[in-house]
Amino acid sequence: MISKGDQRNQPIGPLANGQSVFVDRESEACRLREAILKRESLVICGPAGIGKTSLVSQVIHDFPAALAGRAVYLRSVKDLEDLLRQLIRKLYEARDPNLRRQLHTEGVTTLSFAGWLKGLSSSRMRGTLYRAVERGDYRVFLDHFPPLTHAVAKVIKELFWMRNTPVYLLVRDRVEHRIDQFSAFFYWSDRELLALKPLPAKAAIELLESCIERFGLSQLDLSNYREELVELSKQVPGAIVKMCALASDPRYQYGSRIKIKTVYIDYLMSGHNLSLHKG
């Protein structure tokens, strides 16, 4: 739990302030802010490193403490049971009064909670979750979410349709694939999609310059480095930051020069894909 002195603007879950890579996203921030205030569910889509988590982090951080503290954030889930257990655990850590009443009725204590939760069936976990959230004024953020199964989609639909709990999905698959899936499962359209695109050239250069200072690259020979990195990164903010971080490692330097092609290859080999949707 977060101590009382640190509770301002803190979501329920491990969502750090993403201000360092929050660049030129004011229109997207306004759209997300509006959706949260109006309790509208949303899918936030884009390639790895585009800034989805940073966008959510910054928007929540800017909300008053009472609203920010009702944001339930999960980073990656394995399956339906994992999703349900993580959500119930977050509500327990937030001392949700509806859940606490359920636990008191069943005689569950602080010492027995973990074992009780582990022993619940999927149907009991669903009932426990739904009863807890329907009067709790929560917003649920699901980050790094795998492709949806019908069982998981059913829980998400129950949350935002029947329990007045909007859900925000942060996904990195191709836009067309996700739209088809969400349309089939939730009857969502383009209105429920917030697609993050690469930064404008000016913003990408500004971010690059801040990274050059941040990672101590200014003493190196940066001839052609700026132009090459902006081009190779495809103006994806996470790619700019991570490739600059790699460039600060002496293994990627030859004398005073940066081995930018090696940086780029190792960045891709680490699992990042810069194939961007056109359109």
What are the roles of these predicted feature ranges?
Residues 9-12, 80-110:
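Conserved NTP-binding/hydrolysis module of P-loop NTPases
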